[in-house]
UniProtKB/Swiss-Prot annotation:
SUPFAM superfamilies: Cytochrome c oxidase subunit I-like (SSF81442). This is Cytochrome c oxidase subunit 1. The gene is ctaD. InterPro entries: Cyt_c_oxase-like_su1_dom, Cyt_c_oxase-like_su1_sf, Cyt_C_Oxase_1, Cyt_c_Oxase_su1_BS, Cyt_c_oxidase_su1_bac. Fe(II)-heme a binds at H72, H386. One of its GO terms (cellular component) is plasma membrane. It is found in: Cell membrane. Its main location: membrane. The keyword Cytoplasm does not apply. It comes from Bacillus sp. (strain PS3).
Length: 616
């Protein structure tokens, strides 16, 4: 049986994506879902900025403002940035290491559907009484008091389901990169984006379990009468802060390290030279990940840990600036002496350096424990983390979208529209967040929904809101670009930019279902570039052409995740309604039954015969 033939019709395409285990199509699913949640989180941000545009505004007040604020942060971190990072990991990493798929294709699909249904469950709260309203960190002191509706319960269960999917993805990429690299691809010949994915997956493996434990504790307290965080019964709300931030700070690097990997690929490609200091970049990536687990309590300087603990975490936090600085200078030296081509991805890459450095500088300021008593819970902190997350991660996601779009879809996004998007986004970003440093320094606290006239915050907030509309305009133009490209964009060859250095650019755009007809032989770093420099148009094969084994599609990942989605509703309402417990049991039976079917039914996949490959 073969699935090489393109399927026609909306129904066939929909079924294909619902049942796919192909890493490239799963990348499309992550990209579409993450893009949707990015738009949703952006809309929530726009509502926040409209409310704060003038004093005593009543556009979005009180509890509703708290819900929108909470969902903005939660959506952007867990449901937009994370899946978009996973989209590029899925689309690119197997191609960069010369593999035909990931190690566990079924688990890859299950990971996506777990994320999707977790995010869907979380957003159902909007229509079922109210969304989470305790901030994206959902501190226990606020969450346990939020009993007016089930918003926090949607938060705890939705993030658990989504988090399980993320952990599955991390395990999958660790095994894939360790076991499935093409012959000759040693660890020190891997592209930087693959290195970033490898280290990030290890981070996820250790960072997400503490969050999962915290969410289980929170769920037990709220739904089953537990007292983990209830001081009146001997619990401690500070435990939640430690559990959350042991996850929360590594989460920054879970997002930023893949961004660094994307920029490393872009700088090398469009400077038309090898990445400067490759070995030091690898070690800096590993060191950042290691130090990332030693700094979580800098979020808690004002909690009362004492001067010794504060000093230790302050020094550890400042230390992370060293390997990050190594990366910044290596990118600059990569451009130095290069023949730079200023494409849309390169615009984002160059703009990232000053933007991210500004976020890093304010990070070192916040790392001073004594000074943090002034900065804490002010708009200075809001400005800082947006300079890091938007200036680092979102710039990288936009750069990666333009850079790998032709590889994923076979068509080039319009460069003129791309550069208009960039300039609007760049100007809007700095307009929105630069002024917020000064709002914070003049005393504006974060999370407030209004302020009085004559406090000196009117002008800054108005400028910030105007900047947000620039970002919105940039997003609209990006969507127009995608629609126009899909309708009539120019088709591209395998090496879409003409300067590709890594293996993904050596095959067709978009790649065939099997990726590589023959597993390539890797003879050095920047393997495709080496072949081109020797005048070869194709990679050197490491094996003769033969039949290719591929996994079958399966509907079970969708059903397993859907079962947990159903069960989550039952657990949420089991104290309020008689149907709660039966629905929870039904959902678990759907999930466990599907897992049983997966265990007992033999599925050996199928083969694509070499004659079919030759025809293509």
């Amino acid at each position: 049986m073969s699935t090489i033939a393109r399927k026609k019709g909306v129904g066939a395409v929909l079924w294909d994506y619902l049942t796919t285990v192909d890493h490239k199509k799963i990348a499309h699913l992550y990209l579409i879902s993450g893009g949707f949640f990015f738009l949703l989180g952006g809309l929530e941000a726009l509502f926040i900025r409209i409310q704060l545009a003038k004093p005593n505004n009543d556009f979005l007040v009180g509890g509703l403002y708290n819900e929108v604020l909470t969902m903005h942060g939660t959506t952007m971190i867990f449901l937009a940035a994370m899946p978009l990072v996973f989209a590029f990991m899925n689309a690119v990493v197997p191609l960069q290491i010369g593999a035909r798929d990931v190690a566990f294709p079924f688990l890859n699909a299950l990971g996506f559907w777990m994320f999707f249904f977790g995010g869907l469950f979380l957003n159902c709260s909007w229509f079922l009484g109210g969304a989470p309203d305790a901030g994206w960190t959902s501190y226990a002191s606020l969450s346990l008091d939020s009993k007016a509706h089930h918003g926090i319960d949607f938060y705890t269960l939705g993030l658990q389901i989504s988090g399980f999917g993320t952990i599955m993805g991390a395990i999958n990429f660790l095994v894939t990169i360790i076991n499935m690299r093409a012959p000759g691809m040693t660890f020190m010949r891997m592209p930087m984006f693959t290195w970033a994915t490898f280290v990030t997956s290890a981070l996820i493996l250790f960072a997400f379990p503490p969050l999962t434990v915290g969410l289980i504790f929170m769920m037990m307290d709220r739904l089953f009468g537990g007292n983990f965080f209830n001081p009146a019964a001997g619990g401690n709300t500070i435990i939640w802060e430690h559990l959350f931030w042991v996850f929360g700070h590594p989460e920054v690097y879970i997002l930023v390290l893949p961004a660094f990997g994307i920029f490393s690929e872009i700088f090398a490609t469009f400077s038309r030279k090898r990445l400067f200091g490759y070995s030091s970049m690898v070690f800096a990536t590993v060191l950042i990940a290691f130090l990332g687990f030693m700094v979580w309590a800098h979020h808690m300087f004002t909690v009362g840990m004492g001067p010794i603990a504060n000093a230790i975490f302050a020094v550890a936090t400042m230390t992370i600036a060293v390997p990050t600085g190594v990366k910044i200078f290596n990118w600059l030296f990569t451009m130095w002496g290069g023949s730079i081509k200023f494409t849309t991805p390169m615009h984002y890459a160059v703009a990232f350096i000053p933007s991210f450095v500004m976020g890093g500088v304010t990070g070192v300021m916040l790392a001073s424990a004594a000074a943090d008593y002034q900065y804490h819970d002010s708009y200075f902190v809001v400005a800082h983390f947006h300079y890091v997350i938007v200036g680092g991660v979102v710039f990288a996601l936009l750069a990666g979208t333009h850079y790998w779009w032709p590889k994923m879809f076979g068509r080039m996004l319009n460069e003129t529209l791309g550069k208009i998007t960039f300039w609007l986004f760049f100007i809007g970003f700095h307009l929105t967040f630069f002024i917020q440093h000064f709002l914070g320094l003049t005393g504006m606290p974060r999370r407030v929904f209004t302020y009085l006239p004559h406090q000196g915050w009117e002008t800054g907030n108005l400028i910030s809101t105007i900047g947000a509309f620039f970002i919105a305009a940039a997003t609209v133009i990006l969507l127009i670009n995608i629609v126009v490209t899909t309708a009539k964009g120019e088709k591209v060859p395998g090496d879409a930019w003409g300067d590709g250095r890594t293996l993904e650019w050596a095959i067709a755009s978009p790649p065939p279902v099997y990726n590589f007809a023959q597993t390539p032989l890797v003879r050095g770093l920047d393997a495709f570039w080496l072949e081109k420099m020797e005048g070869k148009k194709e990679l050197t094969p490491a094996e003769p052409l033969g039949d290719i084994h591929m996994p079958n599609s399966s509907f079970l990942p969708f059903v397993i995740a859907f079962g947990l989605f159903v069960a989550a509703f039952g657990f949420t309402y089991h104290n309020d309604a008689g149907w709660g417990l039966p629905v929870a049991i039904l959902g678990l039976l759907i999930t466990l039954g599907s897992m049983f079917l997966r265990s007992v039914i033999d599925d050996h996949g199928f083969h694509i015969h070499k004659e079919e490959v030759l025809e293509l």
